[in-house]
Amino acid sequence: MSEITAAMVKELREKTGAGMMDCKKALAETAGDMEAAIDWLRAKGIAKADKKSGRTAAEGLIGVSSQGTKAVVVEVNSETDFVARNDAFQELVRGIAKVAVSTDGTVDAVAAATYPASGKSVSDTIKDAIATIGENMNLRRSVALSVEDGVVATYIHNAVSDGLGKLGVLVALKSTGDKEALNAIGRQVAMHIAATAPLAIRPEEVDAAVAERERNVFIEQSRASGKPDNIIEKMVDGRMRKFFEEVALLSQAFVINPDLTVAAAIKEAEKAVGAPIEVAGMARLLLGEGVEKEETDFAAEVAAAVKG
C-alpha cells in the first residue's frame, strides 16, 4: 500500500471538507488513490461531490473580449491580489484578451501572437511585465468560441474593470435571428452558467466517466438502506436522472426564472429573436480554479494527525 503522507491528507481534506482522521482512513482504505478516497468519503456520507477547496494559490484576472461572431476568455495569474488591482496589469490582461480573439484561442497560440503595444510576443511581453512589476505572472488558460450565424455572449461576474474580473463566461448561440435579442438571452444564459457551473450543455454530453463515478457512489449509498437489488436499481436510476438535471445546462432550472428550465427560457426567447436558437458551446473560467496555495500551519496540523 502507498504511504499516506501529510500532503495527501491535506489535499483530500481541502477537496472534501472532511475531518483529518476521516481523510486518513479514506486514503488507507483506497491504497492512497485520491479520487477513490473522495468517492469512499462520499459513499459514507462524509463528503459531498461538489465540495471544492477555497484555498487557491493563483491571483490575477479573467479577461473576455469579442469580435464579430467570436469571443475569447483568458486567465492571467499573478502572485498577489495587489498586482491584480494594478492598472498596468489590468491593461496587460485586457490587451492579451484582445490579441487572443485573432488566434485559435489555445494558450500556445495566444502566447506566440504579437502584442501590438510592445511589438513582441505575448509571452515575451509578460516576461517584460514581470521585470517591471516585480512579480511572477503567467497566461494559464484561454478558450475561444465562434459561430457562423449567431452570437457568442460574454459575461464577467463582479467586474473590476471593463471586461475583467474573477469569473468569466462565454456562451455560443447559433441563430439567424435578431442579434440584439440574441445577445440579451445570451447574456442571461451566461449569467446562469456563472452561477451554476454546469458540466455539459445536454445530459447526454456529460462525461461518461463522471456519470459512471456518480452511479457507483449512489449504488454504495443505496445499499446502506438494506433494500433489495431491484429497488436499489430504481433508486439509483432516479438519483441519476436528478444528477443529469442538475449538471446539464439545458435541463437546469433557469436562475433568472426558476419556473423555467434553461431550455424553456431559450425557447421563449425565440419569439423575440424571430428564429430557432441552438446552444453551440460554453466556457466558464473561475480564477485560480484547481490551484491550491500553501498552508504551512495547517500542514503541520495534518502531519501530527498522520503520525497519530
Swiss-Prot record:
One Gene Ontology molecular-function label: translation elongation factor activity
A single Gene Ontology CC term: cytoplasm
Chain positions covered by the region annotation Involved in Mg(2+) ion dislocation from EF-Tu: 80-83
Pfam family, one: EF_TS
UniProt keyword annotation of Cell division present: no
InterPro entries xrefs: EF-Ts_dimer_sf, Transl_elong_EFTs/EF1B, Transl_elong_EFTs/EF1B_dimer, Transl_elong_Ts_CS, UBA-like_sf
Subcellular compartments: Cytoplasm
Broad class of where this protein is predominantly found: cytoplasm
Keyword line: Cytoplasm, Elongation factor, Protein biosynthesis
Function: Associates with the EF-Tu.GDP complex and induces the exchange of GDP to GTP. It remains bound to the aminoacyl-tRNA.EF-Tu.GTP complex up to the GTP hydrolysis stage on the ribosome.
PANTHER family listed in its UniProt record: ELONGATION FACTOR TS (PTHR11741), ELONGATION FACTOR TS, MITOCHONDRIAL (PTHR11741:SF0)
Protein family according to the UniProt entry: Belongs to the EF-Ts family.
The protein's name in its UniProt record: Elongation factor Ts
Organism field: Rhizobium johnstonii (strain DSM 114642 / LMG 32736 / 3841) (Rhizobium leguminosarum bv. viciae)
The encoding gene: tsf
